[in-house]
Regions:
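Acidic/glycine-enriched edge-of-secondary-structure segments
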Residues: 1-8, 29
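Glycine-rich phosphate/diphosphate-binding loops that line cofactor/substrate pockets in enzymes
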Residues: 12-26, 43-48
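Short glycine-rich or small-residue beta-strand-to-loop segments that form or flank ligand, phosphate
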Residues: 24-31, 52-57
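Gly/Ser/Thr-rich loops at beta-strand to alpha-helix junctions
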Residues: 31-40, 59-63, 115-118
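Long, charge-dense
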Residues: 44-96
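Active-site glycine-rich loop that binds ribose-phosphate moieties when present
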Residues: 86-105, 111-118
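A short, gly/pro- and small-residue-rich
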Residues: 117-138
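C-terminal functional extensions of proteins
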Residues: 140-213
Length: 213
C-alpha cells in the first residue's frame, strides 16, 4: 500500500464517516491489537462522535478486558463498555459472542478494526452495518463488511475522525447520498489494483537498482 492513504481508502473513509454520522446507535469495537496500536486514536474518534467504545477480545479474560478498558479511560475515553457484558451475538463462540446492551449489541453501525471474518459476518447477520479496517481487500472481513477501509489503522482512524468532523456540518441528505453512492465491490477492486500497481512499481525500482543503472 505504500506510506500513504490510497484513493480507494479515501472513498471508504468518507462513506464510513457518513455512515457513522447517520447511525442512530453507532459503536466502536476495540480488541487487543487495536488497543496496542491505536488506543488514543480510537478515543479521539469516539469523542468526535460522542459514542461508546466497547472492548471485545478474541482471547477474553476479565483481567485483559479490565486493563484495556483502563487504558482507554486513561487516554480520555468517556464511555468504555465491555467489562460487564449482558448479551451475546448469535453464531459466535461464547467468549467471542459477549456484547453489551447500549453498545455493540444494540448498535446499528459498528466499526471493527483488525477483526476476523467470523465476527464481521455474525454482526452483519444481526442486521448491523459493519465498517472494517483491514489491510487485505480480499479477506472475508473486508468482503463481508458494508464499508471496508483498506489502510494502516494508524492512518485510517485519524483520517476517519477528521472526516467525521468535516462531514458533521453537512445536511443529512448529503450524507445519505454519499452512502448510497459508495460501491463496496468497486472500491475493493480498486484497492486490489492499487496494491498490485504499488508492488509492480517496487519491483521495477528494485530491478533498476540491481542492474546498476
Amino acid at each position: 500500500l505504500g506510506e500513504k492513504t490510497t484513493p480507494s481508502a479515501e472513498k471508504a473513509i468518507r462513506a464510513a464517516a457518513a455512515l457513522l454520522l447517520l447511525a442512530e446507535r453507532p459503536a466502536l469495537s476495540v480488541n487487543g491489537n487495536v488497543a496496542a496500536l491505536a488506543a488514543e486514536e480510537m478515543v479521539a474518534l469516539a469523542g468526535a462522535l460522542k459514542i461508546p467504545l466497547e472492548v471485545n477480545l478474541f482471547h477474553r479474560s476479565e483481567e485483559r478486558v479490565k486493563k484495556i478498558a483502563e487504558l482507554l479511560r486513561e487516554k480520555g475515553g468517556a464511555q468504555v463498555l465491555g467489562e460487564r457484558p449482558d448479551a451475546s451475538v448469535p453464531g459466535l463462540d461464547h467468549a467471542r459472542a459477549l456484547a453489551t446492551r447500549g453498545g455493540i449489541y444494540d448498535a446499528d453501525v459498528v466499526l471493527i478494526p483488525l477483526e476476523d471474518g467470523d465476527r464481521c459476518e455474525a454482526l452483519a447477520a444481526m442486521g448491523k452495518k459493519v465498517i472494517a479496517i483491514d489491510l487485505n481487500p480480499l479477506s472475508r472481513t473486508a468482503r463481508k463488511a458494508a464499508v471496508s477501509i483498506v489502510d494502516n489503522i494508524l492512518r485510517a482512524v485519524p483520517a476517519l475522525t477528521e472526516q467525521v468532523r468535516t462531514l458533521s456540518a453537512l445536511p443529512r441528505s448529503d450524507l445519505v447520498k454519499m452512502v448510497a453512492e459508495y460501491d463496496h465491490e468497486k472500491v475493493l477492486h480498486q484497492a486490489v489494483q492499487e496494491i498490485s500497481d504499488h508492488l509492480q512499481r517496487q519491483f521495477r525500482e528494485e530491478s533498476h537498482e540491481d542492474s546498476g543503472d
